[in-house]
């Protein structure tokens, strides 16, 4: 089967990454948003020939005139009608495929309710009529992209952060940790911090602008207290940012305060462990034979792991916890730990890359895919085949 007949689609909370098997980069990356014209704009929109529903990039351009919906929340599809509009856009406008000639590999967040998986399979066969479908857990695909079968994946995208242990290609749902702090929450926190400085940023349109500020200027501090002190005593951290309307704003300590929520979720009133605690607890709860292997292969994935300073801060925090809890302060034991955090430069699209690798290898293996006949015969029960794959 030709690579162009095997589609890979990674639906995230913020973006959909889609393309074909064996590719090194997604053919298309577009925001996972659906917009409908606000009534008062319908007349003026007629000149622009906007259809009743807009998906993806166009939403950003016309965001003042649309009611915008995000079909995926915290990694899980909440609105299936809108999700179908997103898939229509991906398959027919971006990839320009005829689904009945293609197979598709979809990605699934860890701890996704099985009802969602069932609905996904049903939509792919009933609505789009794909020839074959496979759904794989995102963390496992991240490791494939890194050439590993065993490791600990920290996947932080737009809607949710997961820490997932994987051994020999199998993930462990009962040890998987989840935190509802990721890109979108950090942007919202940055909006809040900037408003305390006197810059009002509250409209959806401004939210996009603040996201750009975050991506350009934010970083993770190595030592939060010292950095805060530095911010109080000097202006060394202050950077200027030019807004789309030409105004210039100053961004200082907010640059590291916003992403700090990944390590200290209480900052934005989210209960639970931060990223370093989740990693440490997750590995320590694993059986003892696999722990060292996981400490040596911690792989970062997703756009919210792209902050400068994140790998070194994570390494420091995990070492501190290991020293206190496991070694009881004996520093000699740290040599054996050999902690290693892998931060591949293309980690923003890691899940997609792993999917493209897997789909490329398996494109001609009939036992790998759930085909249309399986689905017609067994219905949703055909998912059992996948859990054994």
From Swiss-Prot:
This protein's GO CC annotations: Arp2/3 protein complex; cytoplasm
Domain of life according to the entry: Eukaryota
Tissue specificity note: Expressed at low levels in roots, seedlings, stems, leaves, flowers, pollen, siliques and at a higher level in inflorescences. Specifically localized in cells adjacent to mature xylem and in developing xylem vessels.
CDD domains (alphabetical): ASKHA_NBD_Arp2
Example of a GO MF term: actin binding
Pfam families: Actin (PF00022)
Positions annotated to bind ATP: 157-159, 211-215, 302-307
Induction conditions: Repressed by light.
Localization in the cell: Cytoplasm, Cytoskeleton
Consequence of gene disruption: Distorted trichomes and altered epidermal cell types.
Single Gene Ontology BP annotation: actin cytoskeleton organization
KW Transmembrane helix (keyword) present: no
Note: 'Wurm' means 'worm' in German. Plants impaired in WURM display worm-shaped trichomes.
PANTHER family (UniProt xref): ACTIN
Assembly information from the UniProt record: Component of the Arp2/3 complex composed of ARP2, ARP3, ARPC1/p41-ARC, ARPC2/p34-ARC, ARPC3/p21-ARC, ARPC4/p20-ARC and ARPC5/p16-ARC. Interacts directly with ARP3/DIS1 and ABI1.
Annotated family: Belongs to the actin family. ARP2 subfamily.
Function as written in the Swiss-Prot or TrEMBL entry: Functions as ATP-binding component of the Arp2/3 complex which is involved in regulation of actin polymerization and together with an activating nucleation-promoting factor (NPF) mediates the formation of branched actin networks. Seems to contact the pointed end of the daughter actin filament. Arp2/3 complex plays a critical role in the control of cell morphogenesis via the modulation of cell polarity development. Involved in the control of cell morphogenesis in leaf epidermal pavement cells, root hairs, hypocotyls epidermal cells and trichomes, especially during rapid cell expansion.
Protein name: Actin-related protein 2
Species whose genome carries this gene: Arabidopsis thaliana
């Amino acid at each position: 089967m030709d690579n162009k007949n095997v589609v890979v689609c990674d639906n995230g909370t913020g973006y959909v990454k889609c393309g074909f098997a064996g590719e090194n980069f997604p053919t298309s990356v577009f925001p996972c948003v659906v917009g409908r014209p606000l009534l008062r704009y319908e007349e003026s929109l007629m000149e622009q020939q906007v259809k009743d529903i807009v998906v993806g990039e166009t939403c950003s351009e016309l965001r003042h005139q649309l009611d915008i919906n995000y079909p995926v929340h915290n990694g899980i599809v909440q609105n299936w009608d809108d999700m179908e509009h997103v898939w229509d856009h991906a398959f027919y406008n971006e990839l320009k495929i005829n689904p009945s000639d293609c197979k598709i590999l979809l990605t699934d967040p860890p701890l996704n309710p099985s009802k969602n998986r069932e609905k996904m399979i049903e939509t792919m066969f009933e609505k789009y009529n794909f020839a074959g479908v496979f759904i794989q857990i995102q963390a496992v695909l991240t490791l494939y992209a890194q050439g590993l079968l065993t490791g600990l994946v920290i996947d932080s995208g737009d809607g949710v952060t997961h820490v997932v242990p994987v051994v020999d290609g199998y993930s462990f749902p009962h040890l998987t940790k989840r935190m509802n702090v990721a890109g979108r929450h950090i942007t919202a926190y940055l909006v809040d911090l900037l408003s305390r400085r006197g810059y009002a940023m509250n409209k959806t349109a401004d939210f996009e602008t603040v996201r750009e500020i975050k991506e350009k200027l934010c970083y993770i501090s190595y030592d939060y207290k010292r950095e805060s002190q530095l911010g109080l005593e000097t202006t060394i951290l202050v950077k200027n940012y030019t807004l789309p309307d030409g105004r210039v704003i100053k961004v200082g300590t907010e640059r590291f305060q916003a992403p700090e929520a990944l390590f200290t979720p209480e900052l934005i009133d989210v209960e639970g462990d931060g990223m370093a605690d989740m990693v440490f607890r997750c590995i320590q709860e694993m059986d003892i034979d696999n722990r060292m292997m996981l400490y040596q292969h911690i792989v970062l994935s997703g756009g919210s792991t792209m902050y400068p300073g994140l790998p070194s801060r994570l390494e420091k925090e995990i070492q501190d916890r290991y020293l206190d809890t496991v070694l009881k302060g004996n520093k000699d034991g740290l040599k054996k730990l050999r902690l290693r955090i892998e931060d591949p430069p293309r980690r923003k699209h890691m899940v997609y890359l792993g999917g493209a690798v897997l789909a490329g290898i398996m494109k001609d293996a009939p036992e790998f895919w759930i085909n249309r006949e399986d689905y017609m015969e067994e219905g949703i029960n055909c998912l059992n085949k996948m859990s054994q794959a």
